[in-house]
Amino acid sequence: MQKINQTSAMPEKTDVHWSGRFSVAPMLDWTDRHCRYFLRLLSRNTLLYTEMVTTGAIIHGKGDYLAYSEEEHPVALQLGGSDPAALAQCAKLAEARGYDEINLNVGCPSDRVQNGMFGACLMGNAQLVADCVKAMRDVVSIPVTVKTRIGIDDQDSYEFLCDFINTVSGKGECEMFIIHARKAWLSGLSPKENREIPPLDYPRVYQLKRDFPHLTMSINGGIKSLEEAKAHLQHMDGVMVGREAYQNPGILAAVDREIFGSSDTDADPVAVVRAMYPYIEHELSQGTYLGHIIRHMLGLFQGIPGARQWRRYLSENAHKAGADINVLEHALKLVADKR
């Protein structure tokens, strides 16, 4: 990977407590290995998460669901599952592959996830979540964290949330939580609607941190700018950004300076695109389609003159036979002509 900038504040070894001050959320169909490689060029310090991977896929699947590039560090694996033994097996495999953190999904509300008995529905069984976390902690030395909501269905009282955290941190020995500041409806709403309709309740998450000061807690949900992130950091240990980081990845260019205190200059988006070329050429040689990679880059120039032309040209040409980095280079000229 071509290094765009060096971060003077970067610790000698990965510290997810430190990198977790700002992270990009696990997003199904979005934060795959190509996306994470690209985002890493924008910020050296941001903690990146995989898409959720089920224990069944890792244990029984034919593909390599743990594949990633070394350049992605710090990188966390999000697991979906509810069988403590299977989760422990997958956690051991992930640690052996070099992942920096294991995260258990206790927040996804989709019907498909619920049918697999994992995701947000697990919030209703705090003891099982504790058993899952403890099983993983017993076999790995890297952090095991939980991403969850502030409640589910009618179980949305603050007391319910505190009981959940108490059980999982006590019996499960979980020390790090990522709290999506919405509750989840397990029926009646789609996953997209569950990200938008239940109201955000940031004060409740702030209160949770005050009531559990010994735990490391990050906040997630509806965060759209670094200014908002910095405001949350007045109350929380970390901030996790989801859709905004994907749809407008350029915001990551200033994260190292604004969130982590780096003295380096922000990553230049044009330089980031060209730094992707060696990676893209290697992937193309392995049979990867250009469109599978550049789909994550479409929003890079959001708010910059030429952004629309950039998106349109890539969308219309990346799928063509023989498409290679020349497609990106031509698209860059459309942006450069507007700058």
From Swiss-Prot:
FMN binds at P26, M27, L28, Q78, K147, H180, N220, G221, G222, G242, R243. It comes from the Bacteria. The record marks N105, K192, R195, R308, R311 as: Interacts with tRNA. It catalyses: 5,6-dihydrouridine(20) in tRNA + NADP(+) = uridine(20) in tRNA + NADPH + H(+); 5,6-dihydrouridine(20) in tRNA + NAD(+) = uridine(20) in tRNA + NADH + H(+); 5,6-dihydrouridine(20a) in tRNA + NADP(+) = uridine(20a) in tRNA + NADPH + H(+); 5,6-dihydrouridine(20a) in tRNA + NAD(+) = uridine(20a) in tRNA + NADH + H(+). Pfam families: Dus. It is an enzyme of class 1 (oxidoreductase). Its EC number is 1.3.1.-, 1.3.1.91. Its cofactor is FMN. One of its GO terms (molecular function) is tRNA-dihydrouridine20 synthase activity. Keywords: Flavoprotein, FMN, NADP, Oxidoreductase, RNA-binding, tRNA processing, tRNA-binding. Coiled coil: none annotated. InterPro entries: Aldolase_TIM, DUS-like_FMN-bd, DUS_fam, DusA, tRNA_hU_synthase_CS. The active site is at C108 (proton donor). The keyword Protease does not apply. The keyword RNA-binding applies. PANTHER family: FMN-LINKED OXIDOREDUCTASES SUPERFAMILY PROTEIN. Belongs to the Dus family. DusA subfamily. Catalyzes the synthesis of 5,6-dihydrouridine (D), a modified base found in the D-loop of most tRNAs, via the reduction of the C5-C6 double bond in target uridines. Specifically modifies U20 and U20a in tRNAs. This is tRNA-dihydrouridine(20/20a) synthase. It comes from Shigella flexneri. The gene is dusA.
